[in-house]
Amino acid sequence: MEEKKSLPQGFEPIKYLESEKITSLFQIDKTPDWEKTIPELLNIVDKYQSGSTFDNYPYFTSQNASQYLPKLNIPSEIFTPIQLKELHSKLPYYHQYTNLRRVFSISVDGCAVSSFYDKCEEVNNSILVVKDEDGNIFGGYASEAWKPKFTFFGTGECFLFTFYKENRITVFNSTGENDHYMYTDNDQICMGCSDDYFSLSLRNNFLDGYSKKTRTYNNECLNDKDKFTVVKLELCAFDGN
């Protein structure tokens, strides 16, 4: 007869979880069975919430992800395929093998912030990408939907990126110094904030943009100047999202 495993007093085995994300974490953790104590489960959840891409796990490495060529339902007016592939490899592991669809573009949908919110309010995770008047390309990964919240929101999975230097991607992950990952109101969308400056701020119906270093992401200025004019802007969502 198989010996029944004992658990510490006050703990019960977890037999089933509805969340696909948590289920996938168990698979990545390669646990031989489903009997996990609550402390063990919380440890895995902490890894997930920290924004880790699980580079130390064999099934989800940046090296493997860099070989995947993502598809976009409508060709981007900003990204080149090589740039999109490079950015895709920096995403949280559960997006790295997922194709994209464009849900907003100022060339198609106009520059009104209200139109942006209408198109994007149900999109939980997205890539925001901007091209300025000098041809610089930069943006951010948003872990929550863009809605007018008038407060800071988002998670530590958010990050900023730029192709400004040598046309290779530079990523600025969250530092954990504050939780000012995203901000929205009726006039602007922003990412990162400290000392009254935003890492990325798009205002005046997406005509004007600003970028400063903040403690949220410890980022450099995302292009070559603090203030810029937005020429193109797109928001891409993930298939199934």
Where are these predicted regions, by residue range?
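Phosphate-recognition beta-domain surfaces
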Residues: 1-241
